[in-house]
Amino acid sequence: MIALWSSLHAAFISQFFMELNMHGIRYFVLRNYEGLPETNSGKDVDVVIAPGTYHKVTGILKGIMQNFNIYYFQISKFETMRCWYIMDDAQHFAIHIDIIENEVYKGFQYFDFEYLYANVIPYKDFYVLNKTMDTVLLLAQNIIAYKRLKDKYRRTITQNYLQSNE
């Protein structure tokens, strides 16, 4: 099922961020967050959480699903990332949220959560990395994981670099 981002998506992700904040979960959203919660330019929402808080985050997500009468989900795990696929055919709703406990690639942790979290800033009602650290992380991820820099990320890194020097 393919679902376009709707007001239901906006309400769901807003509730998720609000619950994370209310429960004192330290987190931040990676990339493509500028339109959230109203729109989403990416195909998913990447949320990095403090290590050891995944079970609490699971409870939060399941509670939100129940509030929205959504009962189907699937989780795929890759190292410290869990990809949540949450959907409801009757409501024409599907959302993909990646919950990441640490930035790890093939067992190599390239940034500690505490180091990254020291570079977090508020954005609307949720948290994101500042542009400098976002750029550094994007560059490191591409070099380590892909051994090359994708064109779309070249543009983002260039824009962030130019903005930081203005």
Model-flagged regions — what are they?
Residues 1-43, 49-166:
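Conserved NTP-donor binding/palm subdomain of two-metal-ion nucleotidyltransferases/polymerases, i.e.
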